[in-house]
Amino acid sequence: MQPPDITRVFKGPQNEFEVEIVFAREGNQSPKEGHTYDEIIVVTDGVIELERSDREEISTHSKYDTIFLPQATVHQITVKKAPVKLVIIHPERQEQQD
């Protein structure tokens, strides 16, 4: 599967805050990963499936759904109905970035 397009609109580790905008098409899938910080995902268009390590079932999310992922929660997003647009917020990101 191809990864989605990700744009960091505010890259601020010095401020411990980051916002990403994700544009995904049919067939896109995120890497299976966890983070050292909490993550908030807002679905603004499309339908996604979310697999996460803190739940047994795979959940489906669509327009205007908001998802909270605590730090260290391994997760993977799969596009189910494109186009998908996501706003991803890292309110306390403290690690160094490129």
Where in this protein do the model-derived segments appear?
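Short, conserved beta-strand element in jelly-roll/cupin
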Residues: H35-L50
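Ligand-binding loop in jelly-roll beta-barrel domains
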Residues: Q71-Q96
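Short acidic-glycine-tyrosine-enriched beta hairpin
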Residues: R55-Q71
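N-terminal non-globular leader segments, chiefly Sec-dependent signal peptides
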Residues: M1-Q14
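A generic structural motif
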Residues: E51-S53, T78
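Structural signal for conserved beta-strand scaffold positions within catalytic alpha/beta enzyme cores
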Residues: R8, I21-F23, I88
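Conserved short histidine dyad/triad with adjacent acidic residue
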Residues: E18-H35
